[in-house]
Swiss-Prot record:
EC number: 3.2.2.27
Keywords: DNA damage, DNA repair, DNA-binding, Hydrolase
Gene3D superfamilies: Uracil-DNA glycosylase-like domain
Keyword Ion transport: no
Family (UniProt): Belongs to the uracil-DNA glycosylase (UDG) superfamily. UNG family.
GO molecular function, one term: hydrolase activity, hydrolyzing N-glycosyl compounds
Name of this chain's protein: Uracil-DNA glycosylase
Listed GO biological process terms: DNA repair
Organism: Monkeypox virus
Purpose: Plays an essential role in viral replication as a component of the DNA polymerase processivity factor. Excises uracil residues from the DNA which can arise as a result of misincorporation of dUMP residues by DNA polymerase or due to deamination of cytosine.
Subunit structure: Homodimer. Interacts with protein OPG148. Component of the Uracil-DNA glycosylase(UDG)-OPG148-polymerase complex; OPG148 and UDG form a heterodimeric processivity factor that associates with OPG71 to form the processive polymerase holoenzyme.
Length: 218
């Protein structure tokens, strides 16, 4: 692990070597906007903003990307809910349960699955207000997701409205699926078969499919 010092909280970013090519730009962009976004109480807390940068990228095949953290109780790990109360991760777990037949589980975490990096496009929001920090993170968000897509085969974005123009923001060619948000109305996410489709796409690319059942916590 490497670390770099920044002028504002969290003051230090610890990161895996795979993120090195974007770190100097990240530090520059963050120092420009940090004083604005830190005026708010945030979800997650600043110490958790950059926690996913500890993840290597070279062993990842899929990025599962949400728009921003939970408006309360964000952990810095996208979709993570230690007490398994958040609708998004419960819906994701139900979808994987239908796909895999696993039913007796107490939780689900995308961050423990081989080959998968869960990501949030914006790394924080004002406590209780989703997408409230979009304007501050925009340059950083584009920089970091762009970097991730250089390593993965499939980018799966959850939210048809939020990610409607995501392909235009990315320069590297990556297979992109834009699916329904897990909290979408009318049970649209239930009918979405993206997790299956991702594995078909990986096989077509001669990559190992994802074992989605690995995310279950018992």
């Amino acid at each position: 692990m490497n670390s770099v010092t920044i002028s504002h909280a969290p003051y230090t970013i610890t990161y895996h070597d795979d993120w090195e090519p974007v770190m100097s730009q990240l530090v520059e962009f963050y120092n420009e906007v940090a004083s604005w976004l830190l005026r708010d109480e945030t979800s997650p807390i600043p110490d958790k903003f950059f926690i996913q940068l500890k993840q290597p990228l070279r062993n990842k095949r899929v990025c599962v990307c949400g728009i921003d953290p939970y408006p309360k109780d964000g952990t810095g790990v996208p979709f993570e809910s230690p007490n398994f109360t958040k609708k998004s991760i419960k819906e994701i777990a139900s979808s994987i349960s239908r796909l895999t037949g696993v039913i007796d589980y107490k939780g689900y975490n995308l961050n423990i699955i081989d080959g998968v990096i869960p990501w949030n496009y914006y790394l924080s929001c004002k406590l209780g207000e989703t997408k409230s920090h979009a304007i501050y993170w925009d340059k950083i968000s584009k920089l970091l997701l762009q970097h991730i897509t250089k390593h993965v085969s499939v980018l799966y974005c959850l939210g048809k409205t939020d990610f409607s123009n995501i392909r235009a923001k990315l320069e590297s060619p990556v297979t992109t699926i834009v699916g329904y948000h897990p909290a979408a109305r009318d049970h649209q996410f239930e009918k979405d078969r993206s997790f299956e489709i991702i594995n078909v796409l990986l096989e077509l690319d001669n990559k190992t499919p994802i074992n989605w059942a690995q995310g279950f916590i018992y």
